[in-house]
Amino acid sequence: MTPLIFASEGFGLNLNIFETNIINLAVVVFGLYKFLPGFLGKILEKRRTTILSDLKEAEERLAQAQDSLSQAKDDLSSAKQKADKIRNDCKVRAEAIRLESEKRTVEEMARIKQGAASDLSAEAARVTSQLRKEAAELAIEKALAMLPKKLDSNTQDNFLKQSIKNIGDN
C-alpha cells in the first residue's frame, strides 16, 4: 500500500513522528511555556505598574479637584454672604439717606414757611403803620381844610377860653 492509496480509502492518519512535525511542535510549545511567561510577565508587570501609577495620579488629581471644588463652593458661599450683607447695608443706607433727605426737606419747608409768615407779619405791620400815618395825615388835612369854614371869631374866642381854662385846671 502506498500512501496514495491510504489517502483515497478514507481518513488517513500519519503516525510517523518525524514526518508530522510533532517534535517541532512540542519543542515550540515547551519553549513558549518556559520562556514566554518570563518575557510576557515582565511586559505585563511593567504595563500593570504603569496603569496603577496612572490610576493613582488620576485619583490624586480627582482628590485635588474635589478639594478645589469644595474650596470654590466655600468661597462662593462666602462671596454670596458678603454680597447679601453689602446689599442689605446699601438698602439700610439708602433708607437712612431718604429719611434724612425728607427730614431736611420738611425742616427747610418749615423754615421757609416761618420766614414767609414773619415776612407777611412784618409787611402787614408796615402796611398798617403806613395806613395809619396816611389816615392821620388825611384827617389833619381835612380838619385843617374845614377848620376855617366852621370857626368864626366867636367860636375861636370860646375855643381859646376853653383851652386856657383846661390848661389852668391842670
Swiss-Prot record:
SUPFAM superfamilies associated with the record: F1F0 ATP synthase subunit B, membrane domain
Membrane topology label: Single-pass membrane protein
Residue intervals passing through the bilayer: 22-44
GO molecular function per UniProt: proton-transporting ATP synthase activity, rotational mechanism
Matches recorded under Gene3D superfamilies: F1F0 ATP synthase subunit B, membrane domain
Any Gene Ontology CC annotation: plasma membrane-derived thylakoid membrane
Keywords, alphabetical: ATP synthesis, CF(0), Hydrogen ion transport, Ion transport, Membrane, Thylakoid, Transmembrane, Transmembrane helix, Transport
Pfam annotation, one family: ATP-synt_B
UniProt subcellular location: Cellular thylakoid membrane
Source organism superkingdom: Bacteria
Assembly description: F-type ATPases have 2 components, F(1) - the catalytic core - and F(0) - the membrane proton channel. F(1) has five subunits: alpha(3), beta(3), gamma(1), delta(1), epsilon(1). F(0) has four main subunits: a(1), b(1), b'(1) and c(10-14). The alpha and beta chains form an alternating ring which encloses part of the gamma chain. F(1) is attached to F(0) by a central stalk formed by the gamma and epsilon chains, while a peripheral stalk is formed by the delta, b and b' chains.
UniProt similarity note: Belongs to the ATPase B chain family.
PANTHER family for the chain: ATP SYNTHASE SUBUNIT B, CHLOROPLASTIC (PTHR34264:SF3)
Cited function: F(1)F(0) ATP synthase produces ATP from ADP in the presence of a proton or sodium gradient. F-type ATPases consist of two structural domains, F(1) containing the extramembraneous catalytic core and F(0) containing the membrane proton channel, linked together by a central stalk and a peripheral stalk. During catalysis, ATP synthesis in the catalytic domain of F(1) is coupled via a rotary mechanism of the central stalk subunits to proton translocation.
Designated name of the protein: ATP synthase subunit b
Source species: Prochlorococcus marinus (strain NATL2A)
Name of the gene encoding the protein in the UniProt record: atpF
